[in-house]
């Protein structure tokens, strides 16, 4: 399910507080010159009165007017450009000049989209900077292509985004065509806006299974895409910036708190130019995600072994993304889609270096992680785990010691253990090398502010303590102020003489070396065996170990190998009085859950559903109502130790069907013979088979299958279009278990019989009507055939196995020596009696 990620104080953090009241203003402190810095605290804001519309009326179509003459063909862009621009009731005069330090051609990246053309002799891809209305505090940062303008304007505390309108007509003077001018919308202070929910179902695991409950190296081959707004904003520094952000995201995935060896690898970097070749990037985050997901699939190769294949794709954009009700959204992704070529994708609104955590957050969703405050995380996380980890719904500060919550670690582990990460097992051949230095060494505090709040922003140095939160300059109603998004300074940012930031703390540079030396992890000892999942009938118990001797540090290799082991327990038979099977008990537990099925007349009678359930879904609790026949997956997993199917001795373990012998021992090779004797040789039963041809209208008795019969098979063949014969089953008490009272069951179903035995029925409309089951039957069963017309070329055959009668042991005939011995014994007895009579 798509979702919207909201991060704290988006409206205030961007520096614009349009219509947000009340606000708290702290005493001013002096800064350079006569400017004042107003410290605004996000926590002081109450919900604003802004409407809930996802797109307030903050955009209009404008026609920029070029004032300094025409550009002559072949002469390139003039040294200075003047544009007049109407903007929300004001007139803006843009004074622009070429920025010689920005050249997109210097990027060793793939360029897609409409190639820049020499329109009117203008130099394609020219980056311009300048001021607005002569205000030295204003900033204009634009990409200029033959009159088309794309970029950001910051003027008197307002941020404006301008871009060409696709298909827009030129103005009457033949100047630039229509442009969209969008004022970055203020947002409410209502807190989290990310409403991601657990998807109703999981993607199907690949038949290419990984070793169960094992820690295996996973390589997330990633396509990184930047749109034209990113190119306009970052210019020549785009590649380095993107790789720096991805390096920080990869570092988060290397942290041992995720409890899996996951390597985020950039294999391809694409920059989109203006045009219609790329995805449609607009204010709607959901539509942008859908468009990007569809577009990126065309760039991928289906073969996972192909060097050009990627496992997931991320789009970075400077577009202000909006969700359902506000424009707080910083990213969007689908849940649990990492190996789905059509849906393994995410979008991220560039927000400075902290976008690394947004990217990690979105990839966490792709790995099936939910928000730390979700219902599914209750009981897994501690009371403070909903706000200090990567998957927090509102990210203020990520704990560097534990960036991933226990819930996130559990979800990604279960996701990978259940076979959904099959595409991540191949190691990439030619990944792009990510920066290994701390990002703060390349981007100082001033540059971090510019990346987050715009080109005119600078670091506010007067606010202690350093490193904990990055405060940056801005403007509000013409007044200078400081603003923050509560993100710490980037690691490696200088914070004093011979000092630099690390994890939000200011440390001496000598201490940083300890954070730059990788340390591989090692397995700790196996833990004790846990409780058995069943008291009888064959349960499962677990033992696990952790990567704690030592714990990996600084991106060191996480432990590989088996992390969980399991074994069978309590394999003895359950008491004969048990009326329900283990799976039947689990279905019956929902009989009175009327809250889940409010449209059904309650209570319901839920029984297991086997027919029509795919093998990969055998370990889901699929139940159907006995009366209505509707069936649902009531639980994504049955209890450990539940048989995978009535005809199988294999059992479910953590949602996976694991082989077990007929002795209920996991890994055992013992099998039932045709007599359903565990480990038998088939000699204790005999086969009975026959056919039936004496058809007359109504119900006809075919054969009585005795109690104890096994491997029952009944088949009648004939064209369904002319068939007039149908199978039926009658119980000893005269009631029907199948197709009684001239009522047929057309579709496949399981016929549940006394003694927890079931037969699989093909349905009356099947091409070959069949009944089959392993048995043994607990009581006799009468097989009947219902004749509803004139049978033509009908054939009905049946077979089953019945126990052989146990021979009564005969008394062995005595040998001659035995007779002589017994004769002498008898004579001796008679002699003694004779002597006793004489006395």
UniProtKB/Swiss-Prot annotation:
Under which name does UniProt file this protein? A disintegrin and metalloproteinase with thrombospondin motifs 4
UniProt main location, coarse:
secreted
Source species, please?
Answer: Bos taurus
Q: Where in the cell is the protein located?
A: Secreted, Extracellular space, Extracellular matrix
Q: Catalysed reaction per UniProt? A: Glutamyl endopeptidase. Bonds cleaved include 370-Thr-Glu-Gly-Glu-|-Ala-Arg-Gly-Ser-377 in the interglobular domain of mammalian aggrecan
Q: Which gene encodes it?
A: ADAMTS4
The cofactor note from the UniProt entry for this protein is: Binds 1 zinc ion per subunit.
Q: Which cysteines are joined by disulfide bonds?
A: 293-345, 322-327, 339-423, 377-407, 449-472, 460-482, 467-501, 495-506, 532-569, 536-574, 547-559
In short, the EC number is 3.4.24.82
Classification via SMART domains: ACR, TSP1
């Amino acid at each position: 399910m798509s979702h919207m990620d909201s991060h704290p104080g988006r409206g205030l953090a961007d520096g614009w507080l349009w219509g947000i009241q009340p606000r708290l203003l702290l005493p001013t402190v002096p800064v350079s010159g006569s400017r004042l810095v107003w410290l605004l605290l996000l926590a002081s804001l109450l919900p604003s009165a802004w409407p809930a519309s996802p797109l307030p009326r903050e955009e209009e179509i404008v026609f920029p007017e070029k004032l300094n003459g025409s550009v002559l063909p072949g002469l390139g862009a003039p040294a200075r450009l003047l544009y007049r621009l109407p903007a929300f009731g004001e007139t803006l005069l843009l004074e622009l000049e070429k920025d010689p330090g920005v050249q997109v051609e210097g990027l060793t990246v793939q360029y897609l989209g409409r190639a820049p053309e020499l329109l009117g002799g203008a130099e394609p891809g020219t980056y311009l900077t300048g001021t607005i209305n002569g205000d030295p505090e204003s900033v204009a940062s634009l990409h200029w292509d033959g009159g088309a303008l794309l970029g950001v304007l910051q003027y008197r505390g307002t941020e404006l985004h301008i871009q060409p309108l696709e298909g827009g007509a030129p103005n009457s003077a033949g100047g630039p065509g229509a442009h969209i001018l969008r004022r970055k919308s203020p947002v409410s202070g209502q807190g989290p806006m990310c409403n991601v929910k657990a998807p109703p179902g999981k993607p199907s695991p690949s038949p290419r299974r990984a070793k169960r409950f094992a820690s295996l190296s996973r390589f997330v081959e990633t396509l990184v895409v930047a749109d034209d707004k990113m190119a306009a904003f970052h210019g020549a520094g785009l590649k380095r910036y993107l790789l720096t952000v991805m390096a920080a995201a990869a570092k988060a995935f290397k942290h041992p708190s995720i409890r899996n060896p996951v390597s985020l690898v950039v294999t391809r970097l694409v920059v989109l130019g203006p045009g219609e070749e790329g995805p449609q990037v607009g204010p709607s985050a959901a539509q942008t995600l859908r468009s990007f997901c569809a577009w990126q699939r065309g760039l991928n190769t289906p073969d996972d072994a192909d060097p050009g294949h990627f496992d997931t794709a991320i789009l970075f954009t400077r577009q202000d993304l909006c969700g359902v009700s506000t424009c707080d959204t910083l990213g969007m992704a689908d849940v649990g889609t990492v190996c789905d070529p059509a849906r393994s994708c995410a979008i991220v609104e560039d927000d400075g270096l902290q976008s690394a955590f947004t990217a990690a957050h979105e990839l966490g969703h792709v790995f099936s992680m939910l928000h730390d405050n979700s219902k599914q995380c209750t009981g897994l996380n501690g009371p403070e785990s909903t706000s200090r980890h990567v998957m927090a719904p509102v990210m203020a500060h990520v704990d560097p010691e534990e960036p991933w919550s226990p819930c996130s670690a559990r979800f990604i582990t279960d996701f990978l253990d259940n076979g959904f990460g099959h595409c991540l097992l191949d190691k990439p051949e030619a990944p792009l090398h990510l920066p290994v230095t701390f990002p703060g060494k390349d981007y100082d505090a001033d540059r971090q502010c510019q990346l987050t709040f715009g080109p005119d922003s600078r670091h506010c140095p007067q606010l202690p303590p350093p490193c904990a939160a990055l405060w940056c300059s801005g403007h509000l109603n013409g007044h200078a102020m400081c603003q923050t998004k509560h993100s710490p300074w980037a690691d490696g940012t200088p914070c004093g003489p011979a000092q630099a930031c690390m994890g939000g703390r200011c440390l001496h540079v000598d201490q940083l070396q300890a954070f730059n030396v990788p340390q591989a992890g090692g397995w700790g000892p196996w833990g004790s065996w846990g409780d058995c999942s069943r008291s009888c009938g064959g349960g499962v118990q677990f033992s696990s170990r952790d990567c704690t001797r030592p714990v990996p540090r600084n991106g060191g290799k996480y432990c590989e190998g088996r992390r969980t082991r399991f074994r069978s327990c309590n394999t003895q038979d359950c008491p004969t009085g048990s009326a329900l099977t283990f799976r039947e008990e689990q279905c019956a537990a929902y009989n009175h859950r009327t809250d889940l099925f409010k449209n059904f007349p309650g209570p319901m009678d839920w029984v297991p559903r086997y027919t029509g359930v795919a093998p990969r879904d055998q370990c889901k609790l699929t139940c159907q109502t006995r009366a209505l026949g509707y069936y649902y997956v009531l639980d994504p997993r049955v209890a450990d130790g539940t048989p995978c199917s009535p005809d199988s001795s294999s059992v479910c373990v953590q949602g996976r069907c694991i082989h077990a012998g007929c002795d209920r021992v996991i890994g055992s090779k013992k099998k039932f013979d045709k007599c359903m004797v565990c480990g038998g040789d088939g000699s204790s039963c005999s086969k009975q088979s026959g056919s039936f041809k004496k058809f007359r209208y109504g119900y006809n008795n075919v054969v009585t299958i005795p109690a104890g019969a096994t491997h029952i098979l009944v088949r009648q063949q004939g064209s369904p279009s002319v068939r007039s014969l149908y199978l039926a089953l009658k119980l000893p008490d005269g009631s029907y278990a199948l197709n009684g009272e001239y009522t047929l069951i057309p579709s496949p179903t399981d016929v549940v019989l006394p003694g927890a035995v079931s037969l699989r029925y093909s349905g009356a409309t099947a091409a070959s009507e069949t009944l089959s089951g392993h048995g043994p039957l607990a009581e006799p069963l009468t097989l009947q055939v219902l004749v509803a017309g004139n049978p033509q070329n009908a054939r009905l055959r049946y077979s089953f196995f019945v126990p052989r009668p146990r021979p009564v042991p005969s008394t062995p005939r005595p040998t001659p020596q035995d007779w002589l011995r017994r004769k002498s014994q008898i004579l001796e007895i008679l002699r003694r009696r004779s002597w006793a009579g004489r006395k």
